[in-house]
Amino acid sequence: MRDWVVRTEALRKQFGALTAVHGLDLTIARGEVFGLLGPNGSGKTTTIRMLCGLVLPTSGTATVAGFDITHDAEKVRRRIGYMSQRYGLYDELTVQENLRFYASVYGLVGRAREERLREHVERLGLNARLTQRAGTLSGGWKQRLGLACATAHHPDLVFLDEPTAGVDPAARRTFWETIYDLAKGGTTVLVTTHYMDEAERCQRLAFLSRGHLIGVGTPAEIVQQFGATSVEDVFVMLQKRDEQSVAS
């Protein structure tokens, strides 16, 4: 039996008359690199907020790391990490101070915290920058530090929301190598991105359109399902369809 870190059944979220997510059925395995894709307004952000335990679903169920997002939201939040495209760093703090702060927020203290951070710093190559203020780091190093902060507590699941926006191609490539290292260690990675070359690096993808799940599978399976030539073609197709739907 697969070890599902995320499992949703008929998950639905309504804001007044607007249904943002319609009956989402989704499973994501431990150690999987999973892409959640779709045009703006497709329901990605609402889905992530529900899975983080920040927004309650209107109906349906979901578990993250074995805990119900409605009844065990606090336990869910202790087992996830989240990194936004702005990285969530404190510019006036040093690299080491940012790491210690986030580790403490996630409940790591004392020797356990220092041992975990030492291991993490070595893995992400941050040793030489521990005393540098975060605000003076380049985009690529901020990205690396943001990931280190989001995963300092060794979460079961980490959400990466447009993590490589505004970062040069070399830094993006290095970042994806780090993502796969995390996955090999058992951390499930859920990525949202508008870079379709990055989407094709995911092991599986889910496409949302106007709150509906319309495709799940490997990049090759998604391309075949939509009769397209690439994942980018699928994205453009859905974007145009959504724009036409809104216009009509």
Please place each PLM-identified region on the residue numbering:
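Conserved ABC ATPase "signature" region
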Residues: R100, S104, V109-R129
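ABC ATPase "signature
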Residues: V216-G217
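Catalytic Walker B motif of ABC-type/P-loop ATPase nucleotide-binding domains
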Residues: V158-E162
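Conserved catalytic motifs of ABC-family nucleotide-binding domains
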Residues: H154
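Conserved ABC ATPase signature
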Residues: E92, R133-L137
